[in-house]
Amino acid sequence: MNKIERVKNALRGEEVDRPPFSFWYHFGLQHMPGSKHAEAEIDFFRAYDLDFLKVMNDYPFPLPRGLEAIETEEDWKSVEPISADDACWKPQLEALSMINEAIGNQALFIDTIFSPWTTARRLARGGNLTEARRRSPEALLSAMASIAESLASYAREVLARGASGIFLSLGAATDDVMTAEEYATWGRPFDLKVLEAVRDAPFNVLHIHGSRIHFDSLLDYPVSALNWSHFNTPPALGEGRSKSGKAVMGGINEATAAHLSAPEIADQVSNALNETGGRGLIIAPGCSVPTDTPERNLRAIRMALDRRTS
């Protein structure tokens, strides 16, 4: 079974020769041209013989002209939609095209998109939207609608560059930021705007970041797989698989990945297989692995899979 078949079967909950696996981290190349980013991603994919590539995307969303950060109601009102051919997307799209040319016939790849809320938070002065929600709710909602439209346009272009879907990262679907009821206003409509743009893609993943996540209220999102830090927040991996009926990506505790021994990593892989029966499972961390994770620990993931399924 080749990499593409293995991932597609896992997403459908069908039999696989072994569960596919992958992992990712922030390369810190957001100040480099897209070609350098692509080279790092391709080298990483080949070095660890991953079953698919989750492409990191750390290039910043542009601020309105003349602003260093968004702070006032008028600032939020100045946020307008950005088309897919805007220069701000160029480095990442160039990287995706190069990745497709290099590995597109061997494996699927998906691009990371941070949710409209997360994107807005990064634009705000101090990275905090609490004051904007309280003092300028209509202006913030309007800005988020523009951001969602921009990200939806970008997501469609991602597919045109050869990606099989997107990895939509939600940073506020957690009680640590807001309630599920509040997220229904401030997050959900804008998330769905982005996902609707790529609804027909075969490999869309929802990453629910943080602890105390709103898992149950997100189960109707149109994605093929779910990813969350199940070692640090409910539900457990097997429970999430049963509740959602979707494929799950997990098994590896990213918070401890840099410090575990190979036998401890093997235990995590075995536990994931036991919880899910190995169906509808992609072995992966619940979030990015630390950049100081030793090579031997990353290689131990594949070795554990091979031993368990041989």
Regions found by a protein language model. Name each.
Residues 8-11, 15-78:
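N-terminal capping/small domains of soluble enzymes
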Residues 69-83, 130-135:
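Glycine-/small-residue-rich beta-strand-loop submotif within the FAD-binding core of flavoenzymes
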